[in-house]
Amino acid sequence: LQRRRQRQMCIRDRFTAILVTVINLCFCYPIAFYMAKVASPGTSRLLIISLIIPFWINELLRSFALRILFAGEGVINNVLLGTGLIDTGINFIAQDVALYTGLTYAYILLMIFPLYNAIESLDSNQLEAAKDLGSSTIRTHWRIVIPHAKAGIASGCTMVFMLTAGALATPVVLSSPNTYWFTQLIYQWFNMNDNWSRGSAYSILLLTISVTFVLLMMRIFKVKIGEIIR
């Protein structure tokens, strides 16, 4: 029974890591494109600085700040109650809204910058030509921008997935008391139960899953490992 629960925990956490990766990609792609091809150089530099500065603060402190925002009597609930949008407070912690938000925000730079570097190298004349030929915005992105940025997409997805799958501080702070993260289990085997063999086995399992995801990203986007780490 315990092993079955641990398998379910591992599968759930990997699904969460995939979902966070998809959310990060959908959120960061428009920002990266705007910075690379729409914004002026000055605006782009300002956005980059604005994105980097919050990450000067330790990840654990950022997680506690988000917990304060999403708490039952936190800022978000107070604003929603004050504006009359809700009648009773929402338990963002129990519903894992705070957890998904925290994990998405924690690794946002690892998605934005690979996308930004890839899109910036795209010749703007190709976008102008597509526009002159009557191509829609969605079609232009699907046929020109995304294929060109596939190495950046694969790189960003790989880093976000691996770090989300191995996260410990953010899940401990932002998850509900009933939610137990797979990395917490590994930490427990090493530091509380003093069972290094079991902890090592679980760590190897986590590493194997992460490497498998990297290989899957390489196959989906048809890129080589050198393009991902470039």
Feature locations, PLM:
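Single conserved hydrophobic/aromatic residue that forms the stacking wall/gate
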Residues: 1-11
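Transmembrane-helix boundary motif in ABC transporter permease subunits
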Residues: 19-52, 68, 126-127, 141, ...
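Transmembrane alpha-helices
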Residues: 53, 105, 111-119, 123-124, ...
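C-terminal transmembrane helix and the adjacent membrane-cytosol boundary/short C-terminal tail
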Residues: 116-131, 200-230
